[in-house]
C-alpha cells in the first residue's frame, strides 16, 4: 500500500502480525506503557474498541493485532496525530477495521455519534 511518509517520520515494526506504525523521529514515540496497557485490555473479537487520546494510535494497533476486535476507533484532538494514525492504518491495509477521528473527548455529541463500545 502506497503511503506518504514525511521526512521527519519513520515506519516502525510493531513485531505483531506484521503491523507497522508511522511516528515522528523527534517528539513523542511510544514506550512500554502502551504495550502494557494493551496487554491488560480484556477485548474479544466481537467487541468495538475506542482508544481515547490515541496519539499515534499505538494502543489501537496493538489491541487490533492482539485481539482482532470487530472495530477500533481512535479519538484524538490533534489533527496531525489523527492524520498520521490514519496513514498507519492505510499502510497496514486495515482501514476497514480501524479508524482515527479528530475530536475532543469532552464533546458528548461526538462521543454519542460514535456509538457504543
Predicted segment positions?
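Conserved SAM/SAH cofactor-binding pocket of Class I
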Residues: 40-117
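Class I SAM-dependent transferase core
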Residues: 2-44
Amino acid at each position: 500500500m502506497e503511503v506518504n511518509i514525511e521526512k521527519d517520520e519513520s515506519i516502525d515494526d510493531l513485531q505483531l502480525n506484521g503491523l507497522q506504525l508511522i511516528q515522528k523521529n523527534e517528539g513523542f514515540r511510544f514506550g512500554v506503557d502502551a504495550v502494557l496497557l494493551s496487554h491488560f485490555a480484556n477485548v474479544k473479537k466481537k467487541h468495538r474498541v475506542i482508544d481515547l487520546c490515541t496519539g499515534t494510535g499505538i494502543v489501537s494497533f496493538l489491541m487490533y493485532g492482539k485481539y482482532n476486535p470487530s472495530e477500533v476507533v481512535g479519538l484524538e484532538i490533534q489533527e496531525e496525530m489523527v492524520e498520521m494514525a490514519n496513514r498507519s492504518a492505510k499502510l497496514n491495509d486495515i482501514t476497514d477495521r480501524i479508524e482515527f477521528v479528530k475530536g475532543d473527548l469532552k464533546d458528548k455529541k461526538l462521543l454519542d455519534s460514535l456509538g457504543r463500545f
